[in-house]
Curated annotation (Swiss-Prot):
Designated name of the protein: Protein kinase C-like
Domain AGC-kinase C-terminal: 1074-1139
Listed CDD domains: C1_ScPKC1-like_rpt1, C1_ScPKC1-like_rpt2, C2_fungal_Pkc1p, HR1_PKC-like_2_fungi, STKc_PKC
Chain positions covered by the region annotation Disordered: 72-132, 349-404, 590-637, 649-668, 679-804
Highest taxon, organism lineage: Eukaryota
Residues at the active site: 939 (proton acceptor)
Keywords: ATP-binding, Coiled coil, Kinase, Metal-binding, Nucleotide-binding, Phosphoprotein, Repeat, Serine/threonine-protein kinase, Transferase, Zinc, Zinc-finger
Zinc finger (Phorbol-ester/DAG-type) in chain: 454-502, 522-572
GO process annotations (BP): fungal-type cell wall biogenesis; signal transduction
Bias-annotated ranges (Polar residues): 358-368, 594-614
Biased composition (Pro residues): 723-734, 743-760
Organism ancestry: Eukaryota, Fungi, Dikarya, Ascomycota, Pezizomycotina
Name of the coding gene: pkc1
Residue ranges of domain REM-1 in the record: 1-67, 142-219
Occurrences of domain Protein kinase (ranges): 814-1073
Length: 1139
């Protein structure tokens, strides 16, 4: 519908509402009967509200129409040569100027619970970014809600779904009536007939409500609703258990059942259903009011409450109105009430409500403060602590919130006054105001993958209604199968019947089965305005409202998300069940034909031989056509398989590497495998120019030096896009490699027959003369760095089976002195070598636990990340000295950092701004190094940041790191520590490096304010806070601190600070770090603001006494691992520099 049609449609609706209001007013003036006047007054109130809603929509369309005409007009000749605005606020010249980010319009009163989307994105020309309205699903069903537009969309979807379910229920009841009639069971037949009457009445009420909302709905493009983020959020949608309390107070303006002329009013009561089971029922009332109607009930894993109002005009009760409330919405509303009460009592405000005045003079981080430095402080005291409203933690009074009370809309007419509350059954409940504390990380358990025609089906528990893509029936709050690649969703019983290939695979269009099916008619998907409950025919999730992300086939009527259209098979007019039956028949017939053909070929070719010369020419011709080079012959299957295993080619191809022809790849693999076999090793040699030929940390010869950290690389950070850092530049390559295409430029000199792209599993030469150590390449300009593809600057990952350069060691080389930490993974223990008495921290993990939880690959990945940290001896990353294993355990021997972690120190005393800034700068450089090497950390928190005796930090615990994550790469594993998890992780979306910068923002917040920005009584409440709440700040907090936190804690990952291709440079250029000399920070030339103290080398007072008081022994393991299990850990041992 275009603008003119929408204007005409809304004008008609406005005229209709005015006529209804005038008619009701005229009727009201003609009577004094309050029983008649009351519904007329209600009708007039609703009409005025609808009239206001239509007039606002009319103004919006008219303004949009005018804006479209102005948008294409040029404002002057000077605009033609202007570049587009930068994607990030690089200059940060006007932090308080909201116009720099687009005008913000808030629906309803200002609030601190829902920040606007795209806070810092560059606005498009003529576009004004609107703030996300601050309402919950419970707000939409309240009678006095100001959000009429979202309410109409929400109720259209809900009522349509309820109508579909009730119609299915009625069909079942009618069958029951027929069966009981055939059996002669009169009592059961009468009960079923009564249920049939009630079901028909409910369908009538739902149709009336649906018609009313359809009349109010405005079909226009601007009504497009964003995808409901909570639809894909299992934590918000999972069933809840606990105690539900409901008080029914009164109802009004309902359409009561008709009674006789002289009869009294009908008896009315309210039934409360939880998951279709009647849990409570009020007393009957004739005046629509109830006194002391309190009902407490225990619910177990429930989703929704249904309240049905019944009238009893005769023998059987008749439903007259209904209301549905989700239990999760009640919990969220109570959490928000508690947060609002705490916010009002503490005096803290959100960033957009802070004053524009400058920071008070007592704050050490004012814009005019000097550079970093200062004398060491005593333990627990940090230089630059700020007393007053900013320095002190926010007061955390114990706020007791009452029940939710209000009038709620009934369908199809009327209101009901309710009081309800819900107390969750929390086994791990904790007080919100306890401050910072240790919290373990969580990781999604790896599920069993069921391969089926390219699909990787994994069982999921769905907490909402979803249809099966195969049979079409609904999965109602139950488990189902979903493909990890294309999100194809079906029943557990249906996935074995799926024979359509996973269309996300590259060879789907050449699948022989699909080519042979006669019915290959593509769907004609077109955008349509979704105003009712429709589901995607592929992934099963409900479609959002509007046209933007909704598609519908004009021929068969299938509906789909816009992003799922290309995944739907071309079976228009045929159900998926029938299509799968046909394809299954084709597959069985093809197998029979292949068996027959193979038997005949054996008979016909028993005496025939093929000329080797002809075969060789044919193979060479095919290679020439593929452009593979001069490698003769087609590789054998054995050679290709050996090369695949050697290079461990299991990870997906990186975006920066262009795909090769299959023959090209197989030939290269075969050639490499042959050369490796000839040289008698499992990897190819590093050339003299190998940038990493010196080996890993602790290799023989002089230790590798740091790359020169050139301050000139950051000279342009204030201009927004600084030069590329030297760590991303490649060392000089041989002449023949420099002339090759950038995407094929390997980090090591390959065999001369075939250049290969860098492989994750390739190994480095472990020893080389020191004279051949490469020199760092001079830093390139930003333009030069951006000229090549991203893949040309990536560094190859180390091998998980690298044995290192030192002598083999074992458990008998160490004496264990103390336990430093414990977790689900095992222990971290302090140990010393028996010969030299050197101290190390040894991480001990049980093999049985690793195998049971399918964490073998994670352990190998952790070792590779350690080797990446060892590669340049990064000053702020924990280094690995050795790995070894016994029959029952594996051991990581790491450097011992005796200063403890930052969690212990912040619990002893607040850091202050200067100390927090110092630690944040060093953490920023550590994250920068990880990201430059394709690693995201995913578990940044105070517990994992250790403090050395010289006052500098080191990041530890690489168990959740993910490799091969470059700019643009994504993953989807649900993992991290709850308070630090980014919204995209919670929403089960693909995420990239930006999750580390979100956690970095939470870390800075905790160091500055000694509390977490997102808090709750349990994990679910923390997740709710991350998705809905806006962090609060002291009213006088420095503007630079608020600015960087606001930009790092942006919910949209593509708009978050640090999410761009320059990564850490965006963070380093912020005014919060304006006094930082990054070269001095990297080389530890800045005096730390605090030095931890120990009494002796083996003093463990900086570690939690809960762990250090435990006797340092290894508990015996009773289980015995099989030889196959032990093979999983082959190649794990590694030694660098132990004596």
């Amino acid at each position: 519908m275009n603008e003119d049609e929408a204007i005409q449609n809304i004008t008609k609706k406005i005229e209709r509402e005015k006529a209804l209001i005038n008619a009701a007013n005229a009727m009201r003036s003609q009577t004094n009967n309050e029983a008649v006047r009351s519904p007329l007054d209600s009708q007039m109130r609703d009409g005025r509200r609808n009239l206001q809603f239509f007039e606002e929509k009319l103004r919006d369309i008219q303004l949009r129409k005018v804006g479209q005409g102005v948008e294409g007009m040029s404002l002057g000749a000077d605009d033609a040569g202007r570049p587009p605005p930068p994607p990030k606020d690089a200059s940060s010249a006007a932090w308080g100027d909201q116009a720099a980010y687009g005008q913000q319009s808030q629906v309803g009163p200002p609030s601190d619970l829902a920040p606007p989307r795209h806070n810092f994105g560059a606005p498009g020309p003529g576009a004004a970014s609107k703030a996300r309205p601050n309402f919950t699903k419970l707000d939409l069903i309240k009678y006095d809600t100001p959000y009429l537009g979202p309410r109409i969309q929400h109720m259209l979807s809900q009522i349509q779904f309820k109508l579909n379910v009730e119609e299915q229920y009625l069909k079942g009841v009618e069958k029951m009536v027929q069966l009981y009639g055939m059996e002669g069971d009169r009592k059961s037949k009468a009960d079923a007939a009564a249920r049939r009457v009630e079901s028909k009445q409910k369908i009538l009420l739902l149709k009336q409500a649906l018609k009313r909302y359809e009349e109010l709905h405005v079909d226009m493009d601007s009504a497009d609703a964003q995808d409901d983020d909570s639809i894909n959020t299992p934590n918000l949608r999972k069933p809840l258990s606990g105690q539900l309390s409901i008080r029914v107070v009164a109802i009004k303006d309902v359409d009561h059942a008709t009674t006789g002329r002289f009869a009294r009013g009908p008896e009315t009561f309210v039934a409360v259903k939880v998951e279709d089971t009647v849990m409570a029922r009020t007393k009957v009332s004739r005046n629509d009011r109830w006194e002391a109607e309190y009902h407490n009930m225990e619910v177990d894993k429930a989703n929704e409450i249904e309240l049905t109002i019944y009238d009893k005009p005769g023998e059987h009760p008749m439903p007259i109105a209904m209301l549905w409330v989700r239990i999760s919405d009640i919990v969220e509303e109570m959490r928000r009430k508690r947060i609002e009460a705490e916010m009002n009592s503490s005096g803290w405000v959100s960033a957009d409500r802070m004053g524009s005045t400058g920071a008070p003079s007592q704050f050490p981080m004012s814009p005019t403060s000097g550079s970093f430095g200062g004398s060491p402080q005593a333990p627990g005291g940090g230089q630059g602590q700020a007393p007053g409203p900013f320095g002190d933690p926010a007061p955390q009074p114990q706020v007791v919130t009452g029940p939710i009370d209000g009038w709620f809309n009934l369908e199809p007419a009327g209101q009901i006054q309710l009081e309800f509350s819900f107390v969750k059954e929390n086994r791990d409940k904790r007080q919100v105001d306890l401050g910072l504390g240790r919290k373990g990380a969580v990781r999604q358990r790896k599920e069993e993958v069921h391969e089926m025609f390219g699909h990787k089906f994994v069982q999921h528990q769905f907490y909402n209604i979803m249809p099966c893509a195969l049979c079409g029936d609904f999965l109602k709050y139950s488990a189902g199968m979903q493909c990890e690649d294309c999100k194809y969703t079906c029943h557990n019983k249906c996935y074995p019947s799926v024979v359509t290939k996973c269309i996300s695979k590259s060879n789907a269009e050449t699948d022989p089965d699909e080519e042979k099916i006669n019915h290959r008619i593509p769907h004609r998907f077109q955008p349509f305005s979704n105003v009712t409950a429709n589901w995607c025919c592929h992934c099963g999730y409900i479609l959002p409202f509007g046209k933007k992300n909704c598609r519908k086939c004009s021929e068969c009527g299938l509906t789909s998300h816009a992003q799922c259209v290309h995944l739907v098979p071309d079976f228009c007019g045929m159900s998926m069940a029938v299509a799968n039956q046909i394809l299954e028949g084709i597959r069985v017939q093809k197998q029979r034909q292949q068996k027959t053909t193979s038997l005949s070929e054996k008979t016909l070719r028993s005496g025939a031989t093929k000329s080797p010369t002809t075969a060789g020419h044919g193979s060479s011709a095919s290679f020439s056509s593929a452009g593979a080079g001069s490698v003769p012959g087609t590789p054998s299957a054995e050679a290709t398989e050996a090369a695949r295993l050697m290079y461990n080619q299991t990870s997906p191809q990186r975006p920066g590497q262009p795909g090769r022809a299959p023959s090209d790849l197989s030939a290269a693999a075969a050639a490499s495998a042959a050369m490796a076999a000839a040289q008698g090793r499992t990897g190819y040699d590093s050339g003299p120019q190998d940038p990493y030929g010196q080996g890993h940390y602790g290799a023989a010869g002089p230790a590798p030096q740091h790359h020169k950290y050139n301050p000139a690389d950051y000279a342009n950070v204030d201009q927004g896009f600084p030069a590329q850092p030297p760590a991303q530049q490649r060392p000089p390559q041989p002449q023949q490699q420099q002339q090759a295409p950038p995407a094929q430029m390997p980090p090591q000199q390959p065999p001369p027959q075939q250049p290969l792209p860098p492989q994750p599993g390739q190994q480095y030469q472990q020893q080389q003369p020191a004279a051949q150590k490469p020199q760092p390449q001079p830093p390139a300009t930003a333009q030069g760095a951006a000229a090549g593809p991203p893949g040309s600057q990536r560094k190859a990952l180390p091998s998980a089976t690298d044995p290192g350069t030192g002598a083999r060691i074992g458990l008998d080389h160490f004496n264990f002195l103390a336990v430093l930490g414990k977790g689900n993974f095992g222990k971290v223990m302090l140990a010393e070598t028996k010969r030299s008495k050197r101290l190390f921290a040894i991480k001990v993990l049980k093999k049985e636990f690793i195998i049971e939880n399918d964490e073998v690959e994670s352990i190998k990945s952790e070792k590779r990340v350690f080797l990446i940290a060892n590669r340049e001896r990064h000053p702020f990353l924990t280094n690995l000295h050795a790995c070894f294993q016994t029959e029952t355990r594996v051991y990581f021997v790491m450097e011992y950092i005796s200063g403890g972690d930052l969690m212990l120190h912040i619990q002893r005393g607040q850091f202050g701004t200067k100390r927090a800034q110092f630690y944040a700068a060093e953490v920023c450089l550590a994250l920068k190094y990880f990201h430059e090497n394709g690693v995201i950390y995913r578990d940044l928190k105070l517990d994992n940041i250790m403090l050395t005796l010289d006052g500098h930090i080191k990041i530890a615990d690489y168990g959740l790191c993910k490799e091969d994550m470059w700019y643009g790469s994504t993953t989807s594993t649900f993992c991290g520590t709850p308070e630090f998890m980014a919204p995209e992780i919670l929403l089960d979306k693909k995420y990239g490096r930006a999750v580390d910068w979100w956690a970095f923002g939470v870390l800075i917040y905790q160091m500055l304010l000694q509390q977490s920005p997102f808090r709750g009584e349990d994990e679910d409440e923390i997740y709710d806070a991350i998705l809905a709440d806006e962090p609060l700040y002291p009213i006088h907090m420095p503007r630079d601190s608020v600015s960087i936190l606001q930009k790092l804690l942006t919910r949209e990952p593509d708009q978050r600070l640090g999410s761009g291709p320059t990564d850490a440079q965006e963070v380093m250029s912020q005014p919060f770090f304006r006094n930082i000399n990054w070269d001095d920070i990297y080389h530890k030339r800045v005096q730390p603001p605090f030095l931890p103290q120990i009494k002796s080398a083996t003093d463990t007072s900086n570690f939690d006494s809960e762990f250090t008081s435990v006797t340092p022994v290894l508990t015996p393991v009773q289980s015995v691992l099989s030889q196959a299990m032990q093979e999983e850990f082959r190649g794990f041992s590694y030694t660098a520099d132990l004596d």
